[in-house]
Amino acid sequence: MKIGIIGAMEPEVAHLIQSLTSAEHSLIAGIEFISGQIAGKDVVITRSGIGKVAASIATTLLIEKFAVTQVVNTGSAGGFVDSLKIGDIVISSEVRHHDVDVTAFGYEIGQMAQQPAAFIPDAALVEAAKKAVSALGEVKAIEGLICTGDSFICDPERTKVMRANFPTMAACEMEGAAIAQVCHQFKVPFVVIRSLSDNANNDSPVDFDSYIIKAGHHSAMMVVALLTEL
């Protein structure tokens, strides 16, 4: 077992890197990969960079160059569930693109041509994540739909459209569906775990800057706890 862990930004992986033992650094295509162990498990951590293309490159390299057998995506997200507050966790029940539209050819909104409408995470990884929640104390965690697009969402009109298109969406972010799609094609189990940094509204840019460290730390703590469950 070797677990690939992907975060887009430094605050999303800093706690994980600090938790590594026997760390070895590699640089491929301008992306740093750090191999080592956490909780006795072999892991490779990478800060992919922001967005779907960057995440796809990093995921492919984890699978092809480092032979990871499972992938965990960690980081921050904008919340779409009123009962959740900043710092709370969403564990993926499914992952979809929210900015894809080829409905003219009979596909669902959010479904890329020749791909499934939703990418379903590995059941064992989801269960391990749910068991790991207790390590976070009073932080609330739910399973839910996570949607991905190459935009930071803070426009109320755009939020309204997204809610109409994906009424069960719990969180939105900028990498998860790309990671999930790569894992789907390589048949590698995955899970997406996101901590809320904002609520996808007009205040989101301010909230994000203020709370990204908190959200990244919560999500990373969740991943460390998950690794102890595997």
Swiss-Prot record:
Classification via PANTHER family: 5'-METHYLTHIOADENOSINE/S-ADENOSYLHOMOCYSTEINE NUCLEOSIDASE, 5'-METHYLTHIOADENOSINE_S-ADENOSYLHOMOCYSTEINE NUCLEOSIDASE
Pathway listed: Amino-acid biosynthesis; L-methionine biosynthesis via salvage pathway; S-methyl-5-thio-alpha-D-ribose 1-phosphate from S-methyl-5'-thioadenosine (hydrolase route): step 1/2
E.C. numbers: 3.2.2.9
Xref: InterPro entries: MTA_SAH_Nsdase, Nucleoside_phosphorylase_d, Nucleoside_phosphorylase_sf
Active site: E12, D198
Any single Pfam family the record assigns to this protein: PNP_UDP_1
Gene Ontology biological-process entries: L-methionine salvage from methylthioadenosine; L-methionine salvage from S-adenosylmethionine; nucleoside catabolic process
Reaction catalysis annotation: S-adenosyl-L-homocysteine + H2O = S-(5-deoxy-D-ribos-5-yl)-L-homocysteine + adenine; S-methyl-5'-thioadenosine + H2O = 5-(methylsulfanyl)-D-ribose + adenine; 5'-deoxyadenosine + H2O = 5-deoxy-D-ribose + adenine
Domain of life (superkingdom): Bacteria
A GO MF label: methylthioadenosine nucleosidase activity
Similarity comment: family membership: Belongs to the PNP/UDP phosphorylase family. MtnN subfamily.
Protein name: 5'-methylthioadenosine/S-adenosylhomocysteine nucleosidase
Keyword Nucleotide-binding: no
Functional summary from the UniProt entry: Catalyzes the irreversible cleavage of the glycosidic bond in both 5'-methylthioadenosine (MTA) and S-adenosylhomocysteine (SAH/AdoHcy) to adenine and the corresponding thioribose, 5'-methylthioribose and S-ribosylhomocysteine, respectively. Also cleaves 5'-deoxyadenosine, a toxic by-product of radical S-adenosylmethionine (SAM) enzymes, into 5-deoxyribose and adenine.
Enzyme class: hydrolase
Record's keyword terms, sorted: Amino-acid biosynthesis, Hydrolase, Methionine biosynthesis
CC annotations in GO: cytosol
Amino-acid positions noted as binding substrate in the UniProt annotation, renumbered to this chain: G78, I153, M174, E175
